[in-house]
Amino acid sequence: KRIKDIRWYEDKVKAKPRGNAYVIGNGPSRKGFDLKKLEATGQTYGCNALYRDFMPDFIFSVDTKMSMQMVEDEVGLKTAHYGPALEVNRKQSKGMIHLIPHNPHWISGNAAFWTAGVHGHQNIYLLGFDFREYGKGELNNIYQGTDCYGERDDDKIFEGWLKQFRDMLKMRPYVNYTVVHDNPPEYLNHLQTGTDLGNSRVVSYAEFEKVLAPS
């Protein structure tokens, strides 16, 4: 039996956009970059275990195990923690998780850049977004093998993340999305599908540094 939850949830975060939106994924391509550099010129959005090393302005989780670990660590008392209704409504959540606005039911990292757009940001930068897994034995996530993540032990390649991003480009043609990557794989050169809306690009970290410290 399928159940549809149609309850109304008050927006207790009441976020207002400030500067750029910096959305931090946990892909290996951002390893070594100092995330504290982002704080002066915008708002930071992140997901899952990022809080262990850096506390963004907004953080997202959709997995129960990860969400409950974040509640135990009281992440929601330190920043705005977003999740789906299933996690918001758990008694164990202790009111620390806010509902993802107009939830598209995407993975946590993609829910982060979705919400940056809902908050009104029109210039969104994505760091650590590699948009796919690389197979057994490969590093796919900075936190791979740690609590709530486990090992990468199969050869399955999942590309749904990239499709969700391409869908986002079509849904919000008035928002500019910039992927920051020093060694972009070929598929990052083909972010647009169908008509090129001109609202996506890929830049290196050296180019991105100029955004953070404009002359």
Model-identified regions with their sequence ranges:
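Metal-ion/cofactor- or nucleotide/acyl-coenzyme-handling active-site neighborhoods
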Residues: 1-215
